[in-house]
Amino acid sequence: MALINLFDYQEAAEKRLPKMAYDYYSSGAHDEVTLRENRAAFDRRSLHYRVLRDVSARSLQAKLLGTPSQLPLFVAPMAFHRLAHERGELATAKAAGDRGLIFTLSTMATCSIEEVLNVATGPVWFQLYVYRDRALTRELVQRAAAAGCRALVLTVDAQVFGVRERDVRNRFHLPEGLEVKNLLGTENASLPKGAGSGLGAYVESLFDPALDWADVEWLASLTDLPVVVKGVVHPEDAVMAAEHGASAVVVSNHGGRQLDTAPATLDVLPSIVDAAGDRLEVMMDGGIRRGTDIVKALALGARAVGVGRPILWGLAVDGEDGVGHVLDLLHAELDKAVALCGAAGLKDLGRELVQPC
């Protein structure tokens, strides 16, 4: 069967992946309400396009934290790519870079910072958590900067771990031979095995539940790299991020994997854009599956969108080429949608374009 959209890739990936890996990638917290709502929010809005406008020359290029991008799109941080394909993050970084897109490397990667930057052909951001061991956090920041990462993405919505019941039932753990490569040489490179989710036990033992805004300032003081705060769904937190040294926020609910019944990211995006004003760049993730989804997010004020799970579906189906095809599909759909909205470029996408159904 020809794979012609991202839903096709998900269906194909489910057939290829072991159940434990597929459930880990695809699941949400508890009843998965937020997971579903992230998608449904796009379907609740229609595009009120304009006609008889010259769209013969279109530009989709963007600039994120000073870094040029061929699209207003970046690869969102996700853990454990080698569950999907033996080359893991090496393949996803290469596919994104070859298309002029930013790749965000997770702290919880199965390839190290240095390995990924060695093969990356485009800009890389580094996502991190604040560990109870601040020295370990500092070391990761220093390694990311030394390797050539362009920004730090601090995940702030996982101080404690959301309950993903599929992982609990599957007793999720990393298969033999896979480790958290950025933490090799420490006792934290392997996930525990046993009853329940090994990842849940890992997070609860290592991540600092006392994380607060002072830690954002501390992180910014460690480096000249811009700091992105990822996991914001309330406008007042965007204001706080600006006041404590962040350069950008990602409107995100962790893909519906942390607090179930949290709002869909598209629903809260406009209020956060308004609160941020010109003090922060605002990006968003959650539920992006079509070019029209990207148009809606941009029209409501996002500078760019993060794409997560579909990247892993592409990786599982056909490695680097699969990731590349997923990104190419989104590029083609976005270009077509922008034109059909009567826009010649991203600057022509305004809030009036997006209306409730």
Regions found by a protein language model. Name each.
Residues 1-69, 164, 171-211, 347-349, ...:
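An N-cap/entry alpha-helix motif that binds or orients negatively charged groups
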Residues 29-30, 107-111, 132, 233, ...:
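Short beta->alpha linker loops
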Residues 1-46, 267-357:
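Alpha/beta catalytic cores of nucleotide-metabolism and tRNA/nucleoside-modifying enzymes
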Residues 70-113:
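Glycine-rich active-site/cofactor-binding loop and its immediate structural neighborhood
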Residues 80, 94, 115, 119, ...:
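Alpha/beta enzyme core
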Residues 21, 69-73, 122, 150:
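A generic secondary-structure signal marking the coil-to-beta-strand transition
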Residues 46, 61-63, 72-76, 102-106, ...:
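Short, conserved beta-strand segments within well-ordered enzyme catalytic domains
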Residues 97-119, 123-137:
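A gly/proline- and charged-residue-enriched helix-loop-helix capping module
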